[in-house]
Each structure stands twice: as structure tokens, then as C-alpha cells.
Amino acid sequence: MQGSDIGFAPIKIDSGDDIYVISGVSGQLLKVDKNLKPLADICTPFPALITSSTILGNIWIGVWIERDLRQARMAALDLTDDWSNGPTKSDLRDYQSGFSLHPSSNVWSQILDSEPTALSQVDESICFSTINRGIYKIDGESNEIWRAEIPKWSEIEKINTFDEIVAFLSYEEQLVLMSKAGGFAIIDENGNLVQKGVLKLPEVITGFQYEKDLGWFIKLNGKCFATLSSLTDSPKIYKVLGPVYDVKNIQGEWFWTGWRHDGKLTKEGKLITESRENIGIGIVGGNVLTNDGIWEKIRV
């Protein structure tokens, strides 16, 4: 499937066990398998930008935001179902019906009055944040498990208005969250704050990953990324050609794709990069999906 065109401009790939969901700039969705074979036709369940999404077991959960029409939804779609096209933007513009419309093929859907960010799969649940409201943990059926206040960090309080949580992940039977400005917190299973701190970084955090044997990989919004063995360590900064958009642990080494380059960090700590003429959006196996919707082999 290398060199094939998926048919739209992608913005993200969500990874499941044996299935991947590609989302597009206009709300398109496409399911593919590990061999990059499409499992169904492209569909647009809701006519809005998908701002956050993840996979939990056999469901894909997404957040759709249409800011001009002030419409927002969070919904779950069963990965084993056939998905279909939903309402159009003209349907949403009809004020009388707009607020009753939901993404098609959903197993549950909610109308939102605030924008969730950092939608993340954490063990058998979903965590997300809402700006200036709190952090939440829900199950796969949208039942609330707990909610808590967003941690505050005195070191970065001057920019608190512009800060937001970027992601959550499972870490040693607890969960870790990070904010754009470098704040991190460890939360226990009941939503209680265990530890917090601030990472000193040269750029804004856009995402992060953790692997027991590799430590932490911190994605930044400029021409750097960072690694740490422990959250209490000083970050090690690496310079690259542009932002990293997706990173994977492949055979015990960090591999990534991003703005105009692919890269890897070897077991010995050697940084290797190869330039590309386009932008890498996501990785499946040894393949990169570019911003123009083409599958290519990773270049490192």
C-alpha cells in the first residue's frame, strides 16, 4: 500500500490493537488495518473539525468542534460497525434542529457546553480536561468515574490563562498529565494529586509518551524535543528540523515523523534524522502517512 492516496488530507492517526483510525481536516474518518488496507469507505459522521480523539478497546471516541456555529459534540463509535455520513453543515446552520443533531453511527453522544482537550485512553477508561473547569475520568459508556481540579503550578501561574492540559497517560498504576507550559502532575486512581512539578523546556509541550525501557519523550512545538528517564530529571534537549507529530517505540528505539523530517534515537543515544519534502502526520508500522494523504516508508 506504499504510495497509495487515502483520499483526503489527514491530521491524526489513532492506534488500536489491530485497527487505526485516520481523521481528516474536514471531519473525515477512515479505518485501516496494520497493512494499511482500508476497512471501510471514508465517512464524515459530523461536519466539524475533530480536535481530540482516542481509541478505547472496541470504540473510537472523538470531539468535534464547529466554532463558527458554536456546536460541539463528544461521541463514541464502535470500531466493528459500519460508519456512515452524518448531518451536513447546512443542517447545523438550521438553529431549530442544529442542537439535536449528533454524529452518525454513534453508540453514545453528548452535546458540549465547553471544549474538552487532551482526550486520552488510560487503562480501561478515558481522561480529558476542560479549560478552566477540571479534569475528568469516564468509562467507555460515558459514565463519570471521578472529576478533579486542574493542578496549579506557582512557577507558571502568570501564564495560567493560556495554559492547558495536552495529554494523560498511565504510569505505574497512576496517571500522569502534562500542560503546554511544562507543568506535570501524578494523579492516583481516585483523582487525588500525588505529585506535581514543572519541566524547564525551551518550547511549548504538544504531547508526550512513556515507555518503561526508554523513559519519557516530550514533543515540543518548535525545532526541539526532549527526553527524560524520570520526571525529576533535567530534560535532555535535542534539535531537529521542526515539530514532531507522531512518535513510536519500534524495537526498543524512538522513531518519529514530523515537519519536513523523520527521525530516530538509537539505544546508544545517537540522533538520526532524514529530511522529507512534506509533513509526516502519523506512523503505522514502518510507514508514514503524510499531510497530503500519501503512505510512504519511514526514512530512517
What residue spans do the PLM features occupy?
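Repeated scaffold domains used in trafficking and secretory/extracellular systems
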Residues: 5-17, 44-59, 106-107, 111-121, ...
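A short beta-strand motif characteristic of beta-propeller blades
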Residues: 1-5, 37-43, 103-111, 144-159, ...
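Asp-box/WD-like beta-propeller blade repeats and closely related beta-sheet repeat scaffolds
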Residues: 86-116
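Intrinsically disordered, low-complexity segments enriched in Gly and acidic/Ser/Thr residues
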Residues: 192-274
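Per-blade loop-tip surfaces of WD-repeat and WD-like beta-propellers in eukaryotic adaptors/scaffolds
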Residues: 35, 80-83, 101, 139-149, ...
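WD40 beta-propeller repeat fold
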Residues: 8-11, 22, 26-33, 38-57, ...
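Short beta-strand elements that form the blades of beta-propeller/WD-repeat-like
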Residues: 11-24, 30, 53, 57-68, ...
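Structural motif
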Residues: 26-32, 68-84, 133-138, 181-187, ...
